[in-house]
C-alpha cells in the first residue's frame, strides 16, 4: 500500500464498521503504529484543500514491495460523484496515463482493519468493480483517511431507470435481462467463491457502461462474511430493498437478503419505480404485505422466531400478474415471484437464477443490443465460479456457442 499526505476533509467523522468487530478486525497497538509508519514512509506532498475539489492534485507512490520498483502516481480530482456517512467518492484522472478512476475516501479508525479494503482485495470478476490500489492520507488533525482507487464506470442502473421514467417509457426488455443476469452473476461469485454477503444491493450500487451495458457491483462498505451462529446487525441495506427478515430485526440472516434485494431491483426495472416504497421499516412491511399477503406463522418463524405470536392484519396476496402490465413476459413475473419469498430458504439462489428461462434470449448466439452491438461478456466463467455445479446446470448455464470460453468444463 502507498501513502499520501493531503489536507483535511471536514464533516466525515463516522467510525467505519457496523459494530460487528471480530478478533481478526483488531490490529494490535504496536502493529497498528508500525503499519501506519510503514505506509507513511514515502510521505507525498501535502495538498492544500481537501483533495477532492476540482483541480487538486494528489501525489502518491505505489509498488516498492516484493522487488517491484516504486512508482509515483498523480491524480487530479475532477468532481465529486457520491458522498454519504462513509465519506466521499470523486472522479479523478491519472496524470501519467490519462486514465479516469474513482477514488473513495473514508475516515479510517486506526485501531481496526478496514473491512471494505480486505473484501475488495479478494475480488476479481467482470461484474464487480475492481480495486486498482489504495493509499492513506492524513490531515492536520492527524485523522487518517483510506483512499480506494477504483475503476471508473460512468453510469448507474439508478440513473438509467430515471432516464426511462422521465421519458415515460419502459426500459427495453433486453436491458432488464442483461442487467439482472449480470447482477446475479456477481452475486453468485461473491456468495459462492468469496463467502461474502453484500448487504446493500440497490440500483445506485450497480454501475453500468452505457455503451457496452456491462454491469459492475460496487460499494462493499457494508459487505461481510456471514458466519452461521454469529449475530449480525439487522439495520443494514437501504430502504425499498431490505429483506423482510431485516425489517423484523433478525440477526442470523443469510446471503438470501441479497437475493431479495435483487428481486426488488428487477421489479423496479420492470415497473420503472420501486415495488416497496416506504420511509420507515413499518411502512415497508405494510407495502410488502400488500403484495405478498400476510406471512404465515411458519414464514414468520423463518424470518425471526421472536415474532410468531405477533398479530398481523390478515391481508390476501395480490396476484403478481396484476402488479405488472398485461404484456409483461410470464418468465419475468415468474422470476420475481421466486425471489420475493418471505422464507429466505425458499428464495432462488443466485447461480440457479442464471439458468432461469427469463434469460434464454441472452443465450441466443444471434442476440444483439438495440444498437446492433454484441452483448457484453456473459459466459466467460472461471473454474472457481462453477466449482461443484452439477453437469445438467452447466449445460443450461453455458450455451453451446460459448463453451470454448470455458474449456475446463469439458462439455
Swiss-Prot record:
Belongs to the protein kinase superfamily. CMGC Ser/Thr protein kinase family. GSK-3 subfamily. GO terms for biological process: cell differentiation; signal transduction. It catalyses: L-seryl-[protein] + ATP = O-phospho-L-seryl-[protein] + ADP + H(+); L-threonyl-[protein] + ATP = O-phospho-L-threonyl-[protein] + ADP + H(+). It comes from Medicago sativa (Alfalfa). This is Glycogen synthase kinase-3 homolog MsK-1. InterPro entries: GSK-3, Kinase-like_dom_sf, Prot_kinase_dom, Protein_kinase_ATP_BS, Ser/Thr_kinase_AS, STKc_GSK3. ATP binds at residues 81-89, 104. GO terms for molecular function: ATP binding; protein serine kinase activity; protein serine/threonine kinase activity. It is an enzyme of class 2 (transferase). Leaves, petioles, roots, stems and nodes. The keyword Ligase does not apply. The modification Phosphotyrosine is found at residue 235. It comes from the Eukaryota. The active site is at residue 200.
Amino acid at each position: 500500500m502507498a501513502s499520501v499526505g493531503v489536507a483535511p476533509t471536514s464533516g466525515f467523522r463516522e467510525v467505519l464498521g457496523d459494530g460487528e468487530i471480530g478478533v481478526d478486525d483488531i490490529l494490535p497497538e504496536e502493529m497498528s503504529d508500525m503499519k501506519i509508519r510503514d505506509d507513511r514512509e514515502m510521505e507525498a506532498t501535502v495538498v492544500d484543500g481537501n483533495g477532492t475539489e476540482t483541480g487538486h492534485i494528489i501525489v502518491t507512490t505505489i509498488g516498492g514491495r516484493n522487488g517491484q520498483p516504486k512508482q509515483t502516481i498523480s491524480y487530479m480530482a475532477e468532481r465529486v460523484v457520491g458522498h454519504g456517512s462513509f465519506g466521499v467518492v470523486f472522479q479523478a484522472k491519472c496524470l501519467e496515463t490519462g486514465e479516469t478512476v474513482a477514488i473513495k475516501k473514508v475516515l479510517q479508525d486506526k485501531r481496526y482493519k478496514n473491512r471494505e479494503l480486505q473484501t475488495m482485495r479478494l475480488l476479481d470478476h467482470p461484474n464487480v468493480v475492481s480495486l486498482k490500489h489504495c493509499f492513506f492520507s492524513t490531515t492536520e488533525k492527524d485523522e487518517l483517511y483510506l483512499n480506494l482507487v477504483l475503476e471508473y464506470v460512468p453510469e448507474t442502473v439508478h440513473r438509467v431507470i430515471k432516464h426511462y421514467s422521465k421519458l415515460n417509457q419502459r426500459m427495453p426488455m433486453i436491458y432488464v435481462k442483461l442487467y439482472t443476469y449480470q447482477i446475479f452473476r456477481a452475486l453468485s461469485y461473491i456468495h459462492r467463491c468469496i463467502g461474502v454477503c453484500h448487504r446493500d444491493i440497490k440500483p445506485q450500487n450497480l454501475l453500468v457502461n452505457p455503451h457496452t451495458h456491462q454491469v459492475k457491483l460496487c460499494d462493499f462498505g457494508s459487505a461481510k462474511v456471514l458466519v452461521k451462529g454469529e449475530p449480525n446487525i439487522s439495520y443494514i441495506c437501504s430502504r425499498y430493498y431490505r429483506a423482510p427478515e431485516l425489517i423484523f430485526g433478525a440477526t442470523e440472516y443469510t446471503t438470501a437478503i441479497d437475493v431479495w434485494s435483487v428481486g426488488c431491483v428487477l421489479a423496479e426495472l420492470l415497473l420503472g419505480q420501486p415495488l416497496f416504497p416506504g420511509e420507515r421499516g413499518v411502512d415497508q412491511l405494510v407495502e410488502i404485505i400488500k403484495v405478498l399477503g400476510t406471512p404465515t406463522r411458519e414464514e414468520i418463524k423463518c424470518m425471526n422466531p421472536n415474532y410468531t405470536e405477533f398479530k398481523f392484519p390478515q391481508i390476501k396476496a395480490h396476484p403478481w400478474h396484476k402488479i405488472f402490465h398485461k404484456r409483461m413476459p410470464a418468465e419475468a413475473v415468474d422470476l420475481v415471484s421466486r425471489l420475493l419469498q418471505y422464507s429466505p430458504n425458499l428464495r432462488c439462489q443466485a447461480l440457479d437464477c442464471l439458468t432461469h428461462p427469463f434469460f434464454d434470449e441472452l443465450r441466443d448466439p444471434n442476440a444483439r443490443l438495440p444498437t446492433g452491438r454484441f452483448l457484453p461478456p456473459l459466459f466467460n466463467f472461471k473454474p472457481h465460479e462453477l466449482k461443484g455445479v452439477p453437469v445438467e446446470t452447466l449445460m443450461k448455464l453455458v450455451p453451446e456457442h460459448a463453451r470454448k470460453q470455458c474449456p475446463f468444463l469439458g462439455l
